[in-house]
């Protein structure tokens, strides 16, 4: 166990991509040079005023940032505890937080002379966000998606195709996000000269976990400023769903040194942690190596990856970003979980109390906020990251509830 004060958060990752014992680079030799090229380009352009100005312009005028903070007064009143606020990432162009990252990585790809971008996707939001920026920049786009997710996220598959992307359904393994990521990595190994891999979460080999975090940290920077303007102080607690964990790290990172602000990451408990049918490696997993980095994983006794389950395609992943693993071990963040049933209940409660239809991923965060807020006094503030909108999930929910559309 790492003590909370041993490592300062802004010193991480180190030059080799480590967050304490997590992260790093565990890839085939053929990918070492492309990763070094990417790291050098990222560090160069992160200090380039022209790149940063273009990024800011696109976030403001294309994505629609800053996303607003919304005080859910009716919901807060009905719960009878802390005041609940939402960071409205669902209002971004494409409907989720994913576009914050794809805009940044696509601009990098353009400057690095790449003509083709590839991506993996689970819920389809990262695929849509990648296809969107590829269309805008005139780049070829290929998206890998597990065959199970292709079925349950048919709307987003059609959106990607409308945007000009080629969507490849992956039939291997559990046919979900893990397998899509495997195939995307294979594509990149084969086509490194002209292809840029836009990873959608804070996982993968260094520099991806840090780079995706830095592009998503606009969420937390804005939220920090907005909460100070609206309430005169910082929130008492942050709540965000965690699959790979990019929306959560995006919110958490600018608050890490504010020790008075509690941080809660909400994993997908699926049918219940005790059933084994879940996607909660921080709650019930152990450290191992997957997709180029060391982190908490869902493994069996032989070190084989266990098949995951969640009603939410975007949380249906057996690993988690290495920075979350470090935040768990050092005690700075707490990781909890919500079941499919709890997420569905939260989906309906938020929809009917505030007129906001959240994504099933975001509904896991809402579910925990519904538990947390009543335990706190009315002068406390809970800020929930509403990472995406729920249009994409309507058919999944209708089918589960026996409704034919």
Swiss-Prot record:
Keyword Protein biosynthesis present in the record's keywords: the answer is: no
The record, for PANTHER family, names: TRYPTOPHAN SYNTHASE (PTHR48077:SF3), TRYPTOPHAN SYNTHASE-RELATED (PTHR48077)
User: What cofactor does this protein call for?
Assistant: pyridoxal 5'-phosphate
Q: Which reaction does it catalyse?
A: (1S,2R)-1-C-(indol-3-yl)glycerol 3-phosphate + L-serine = D-glyceraldehyde 3-phosphate + L-tryptophan + H2O
Q: What is this protein called?
A: Tryptophan synthase beta chain
Which key words tag this protein in UniProt? Amino-acid biosynthesis, Aromatic amino acid biosynthesis, Lyase, Pyridoxal phosphate, Tryptophan biosynthesis
The UniProt subunit note reads as follows: Tetramer of two alpha and two beta chains.
Q: Which family does it belong to?
A: Belongs to the TrpB family.
Identify the species of origin. Methylococcus capsulatus (strain ATCC 33009 / NCIMB 11132 / Bath)
Highest taxon in the source lineage: Bacteria
| A GO term, aspect molecular function | tryptophan synthase activity
Q: Name one GO cellular component term.
A: cytoplasm
* Enzyme Commission number(s) of this protein: 4.2.1.20
Gene that encodes the chain: trpB
EC class of the enzyme, as a word: lyase
Pfam families linked? PALP (PF00291)
- Known role: The beta subunit is responsible for the synthesis of L-tryptophan from indole and L-serine.
């Amino acid at each position: 166990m790492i003590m909370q004060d041993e490592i300062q958060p802004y010193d991480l990752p180190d030059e080799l991509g480590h967050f304490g014992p997590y992260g790093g680079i565990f890839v085939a030799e053929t990918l070492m040079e492309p990763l070094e090229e990417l790291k050098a380009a990222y560090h160069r352009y992160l200090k380039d005023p022209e790149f940063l100005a273009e990024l800011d312009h696109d976030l403001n005028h294309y994505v629609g940032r800053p996303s607003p903070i919304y005080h859910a007064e009716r919901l807060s009143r009905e719960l009878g505890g802390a005041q609940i606020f939402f960071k409205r990432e669902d209002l971004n162009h494409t409907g989720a937080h994913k576009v914050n990252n794809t805009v940044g990585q696509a601009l990098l790809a353009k400057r690095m002379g790449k003509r083709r971008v590839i991506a993996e996707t689970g819920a389809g939001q990262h695929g849509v966000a990648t296809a969107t920026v590829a269309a805008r920049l005139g780049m070829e786009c290929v998206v890998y998606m597990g065959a199970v997710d292709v079925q349950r996220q048919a709307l987003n598959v059609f959106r990607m195709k409308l945007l000009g992307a080629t969507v490849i359904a992956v039939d291997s393994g559990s046919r979900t996000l893990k397998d899509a990521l495997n195939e995307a990595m294979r594509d990149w190994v084969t086509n490194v000269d002209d292809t840029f891999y836009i990873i959608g979460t804070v996982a993968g080999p260094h520099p991806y976990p840090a780079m995706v975090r830095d592009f998503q940290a606009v969420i937390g920077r804005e939220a920090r400023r907005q909460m100070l303007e609206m309430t005169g102080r910082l929130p008492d607690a942050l709540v965000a769903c965690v699959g790979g964990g990019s929306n959560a790290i995006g919110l958490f990172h600018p608050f890490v040194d504010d020790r008075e602000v509690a941080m809660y990451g909400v994993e997908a408990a699926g049918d219940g942690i005790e059933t084994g049918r879940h996607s909660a490696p921080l709650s019930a997993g152990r450290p191992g190596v997957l997709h180029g980095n060391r982190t908490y994983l869902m493994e069996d006794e032989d070190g084989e990856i266990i098949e995951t389950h969640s009603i939410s395609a975007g949380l249906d992943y057996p690993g988690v970003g290495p920075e979350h693993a470090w935040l768990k071990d050092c005690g700075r963040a707490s990781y909890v979980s919500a079941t499919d049933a709890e997420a569905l209940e939260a989906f309906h409660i938020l929809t009917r109390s505030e007129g906001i239809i959240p994504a099933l991923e975001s509904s896991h965060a809402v579910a925990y906020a519904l538990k947390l807020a009543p335990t706190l006094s009315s002068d406390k503030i809970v800020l929930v990251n509403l990472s995406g909108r729920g249009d994409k999930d309507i058919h999944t929910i209708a089918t589960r509830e026996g409704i034919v559309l």
